[in-house]
């Protein structure tokens, strides 16, 4: 997948609404906007501009356009967000024009993928974007926010740094063990290894907890017939989800 071309996609949910946002990212983004608006004025970064959109010389819509100049954008590339009226017809026409002027349709998640490749996110932050979008509870939301802030990524970076440091010490021991060079006491090496194992264990436990927060947990309610399993389920949900009867 090339990151040298320009991509376009609808950023807001599809369907009819008051507004829709079409996003462009890539080197041709400013030129495509100039063709859409029939203007040659240079776009001002991070300034909302009210401009008309044209198709075949006729007015298509009026829109608010914001230009984010590379590398100070979500993807790290030249990026443009076009806020137009949320008519499916207008959105489709606008995207077709962007394709005609040199863009291609973005693949699912490609904007975030480009942000990752351009160093705007680490991998845990990139995954956290999707986790945040699909979060359904306060706990899953907070976990996604924590990852998006880079907390998990910093812990992985710390683990990597300590492993590299340990490897360096061990290689030094192997290469210069026969020379009169002060070496690290075995107790210090053991302490470093224990520290690495503790960090690794913590990350493994956080993965298990995070998986439950993201995907939920399957909890069976088990018991003999007519022992109140359905009533217990309804009590947990605070609604009559399962059919119950007072008669055995």
Regions found by a protein language model. Give the residues of each.
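Weak global preference for isoleucine
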Residues: 7, 32, 65-66, 82, ...
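Conserved G1/Walker A P-loop phosphate-binding module
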Residues: 16, 20-24, 36-38, 169-248
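A glycine-rich (often HGG/GG-containing) alpha/beta subdomain
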Residues: 1-142, 146, 150
